[in-house]
Amino acid sequence: MKLHNITLKGLALGVLFVASSCSDDFLDTKPDGLIDADDVNATMQKDPSLVQSYLTGAYMNFYNGGEWRTSHDIYGIQGLRIALDMMTDDVTLPRNAQWFSFDYQLDNRMSSYRRTTATWRELYQVINDANTVIEFLKPADDSEPEGDVRKMLGQAYALRALNYYYLINMWQQPYSVNPDAPGVPVKTESEYRPERVPVKEVYDQIISDITTAYSYLEGQNITDKSSISEYAAAFIYANVLMFTGDYAGAAEWAEKAIKGGRLNSNADMLSGFNSLDMPEVLWGYKVDTENTSYYGSFFSHVDTYMPGYGGQVGYRKLIASELYDQIADNDIRKKWFGYEEDYNLLEVDFSYEQGNGWLPYLSNKFRDKYLTSLGAEGPFTSDVIYMRVAEMYYVAAEAYYLNNQPEKAQEVMTAIMSTRVPGYTCTSTGDALYKEICVNKRIDMFEEGSRLFDIKRRNESIDRALSENAPIAQLDYINAVKYKGQDDKMIYMIPDAEIQNNPEITVQNP
């Protein structure tokens, strides 16, 4: 179905574009008046600030889920990333209750559940926002956009690519399993394919979008880390190519992304991961008292010492002992874990963990600004970090290894790990080198949402029984202890609401 024209209600443009980007009211089959699409496009080209609210809205909807935010565990991308991490072997939830417990039990994928329905809607909501920006700003004569138009278009294309990347990898098995498998519907600014578009064709759209995004963003010198830059676009590109098996390309794009930041110092590593000013950050969301989602927020669930769900409420997420045991004592990341009296300013009770011998597994990696500033900042106003250059070092190292360039993999590992472990030099070879890359990525990216996609891409065999702080008896009862990354339980089912309203979807996931 081609969308050749846009019809707009006969409102003054200056009023129309102040509206929130989460609305589709600009589409109207029976308008009071018509504005030609070319006229709209020309107006936007002259004054792209008229479209800024849509791009701003896209970023906000990505952060908090917009109108589809339904509860304290469904609040945009960071809620989803916690859910994805809970499906892995990195994190344990000893009490196996409260928010994210069904994700931990690998039992939150059914077509009627909140997780699948809200996530589907949240991701497509951002895609719709991006489509609106592209439709309004894309030059009608296919000329090269310039200035702010070029920057805004680049960001919109990158957002669209990223959201399709999440959709295709949560609703279908990895590209390598079957490129022809039914994927997800694809909407762009000019075309809507409501059927389950094959996996390869979804990836073709993603690669086309992220290629365009990077070409528009390159050299634009976007220094505001709450906006997607060329380095953030390269980050997306590298991860996409890891799934398609283009390891030479993945290494190349990861190296480009790495140029956008510098590795953390020891002080940075222990700062609480709560500010976009951290040197490794490429992209994130600036949170303040106006846009915080408070208890339904990332730091409410991951800060061990705050009055949130992961702190005073008591449903703490611990590092799996199997992973913790692989962190060297002289590794700065070891200090991300274990009870710290100086951090416990609100006197949170840890008697449950202490009684079970689990104090070493408490997480200190994420600490809210409210505590690190000693109350100078508001509660749960910590910035949310989406991308760090550290991840790209591990992506580059793995890509080099898989592309039969072990010396390059060693070089990249030495570069990042020497900032984590004093005097580190990577000399491992063969399988030991690959394990070193994968394990250190798990440690570095703890609770940052990357682990599940790695498990799926590699089809890893997971055994949660290797961690003594996991509630194995409860997990075993529901068959959530041992599994493989490409088991059916690792993909979501298409939401009932989508199937009921979209007759073109005729195949459901198992």
Each model region followed by its residue ranges:
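Sec-dependent bacterial lipoprotein signal peptides
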Residues: M1-S20
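Membrane-proximal, proline-rich intrinsically disordered regions
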Residues: L3, C22-G79, A254, G314-Y315, ...
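Short, surface-exposed recognition loops and adjoining beta-strand edges that mediate ligand/DNA contacts
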Residues: D38, H72-D89, L93, Q173-D180, ...
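Conserved, well-structured interaction surfaces
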Residues: P94-M170, V197, Y214-Q220, E377-V384, ...
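Hydrophobic-face positions in mid-chain alpha helices that act as interaction patches
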Residues: E191, A251-I385, V389, D444, ...
